[in-house]
Amino acid sequence: MLKRLAGACLLLLIIAICSGCSSLAYYQQAVFGQIELLSKKRDLVEVLSDVSVPLEVREKLRLAQRLTTFAEARVGLPVGSTFDSYADIDRPYVVWNVVATPELSMIPKTWCFPIAGCVSYRGYFSHEKAKLFAHTLRQRGYDVAITGVRAYSTLGWFKDPILNTVIHYSDPELASLIFHELSHQMIYISDDSIFNESFATVVEQEGTRRWLENTGHPDAIIPYQTKKRRQQTFISLIMNYRDLLSEIFGANQPDDWKRAQKQILFGHFKKEYKKLKHQWNGDSTYDAWMSRNLNNAHFASTGTYYHYVPVFQTLLADHQYD
């Protein structure tokens, strides 16, 4: 444990030297948030033998073990010591990401870091600190979204644990998460969030499909496929309106006209979602997303994960899904 803490503190020192003091407070919360996570890690073997741990938690962790084995053997993902431990951090999200766009643009603001490169979000281990940062961005005229994140990859810098934040996931959801995060250890391009997340999304989808088909879960395939079809329909709706908003913002018109058209489009978007929900027999999966005071940042953050998905899906099909 002391070795891990020393390593994290050294990392903070290196980052501070590279970045200057102006960003030191942000890096401090990032490093000490990671230290907190590391301090709560327990080896999976230890947790699985601890009868004081709820049975449903141990069963989900056993599934995680099987999933990492499958990820390495059947999906070709690098596993190593990733997900061979468990951490209960006693909160619903591990970090909160802040995404911001100009009021009349769909291009997200980026932040650059020594390790991850430039990314279109800024993560906080504290919800309150995320909200404070979001407030400063709003005061500067940005559209801002805060999104809770249940897991993330340190890209092999640390041995990432399974977190309590995902223990309630269904089996296919946990499979998707594990495949997604492991894919970042296979390929991660600095300064290209859209490529990285789109690639991970396709690996997640294909890996989960293979796992369901190869591990005797026929009863889960149809519900999973239904969920993914609805997800794709909803994402397509978001991407369509993102493009419409981009057209409005690029038009040779006054800013007041653009602002008015933006609100009109948000109204149309909500109406189309209501139609989808009716077609889905009242499925409320995306109600929480829709309940927010929608702005450009919500549409931009979704685009990060799905922009190149059709391209990667085509490449996968061209190579016979191998």
Predicted features, each with a name:
Residues S236-D322:
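Pan-zinc metallopeptidase signature
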Residues L67-Q231:
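Acidic/His-rich structured neighborhood in mature extracellular/periplasmic domains
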Residues I17-R42:
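Bacterial Sec signal peptide processing site at the extreme N-terminus
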Residues Q34-A71:
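Amphipathic alpha-helical packing elements
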Residues A8-S19:
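Bacterial N-terminal signal peptides
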Residues M1-C9:
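Bacterial N-terminal signal peptides that target proteins for export
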Residues D43, E56-E59, L63-R66, K129-L132, ...:
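Extracytoplasmic/secreted proteins, especially bacterial periplasmic and envelope-associated proteins
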Residues L38-V53, W111-V119, R292, V309-P310:
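Acidic/histidine-rich, surface-exposed loop or edge segments in extracytoplasmic proteins
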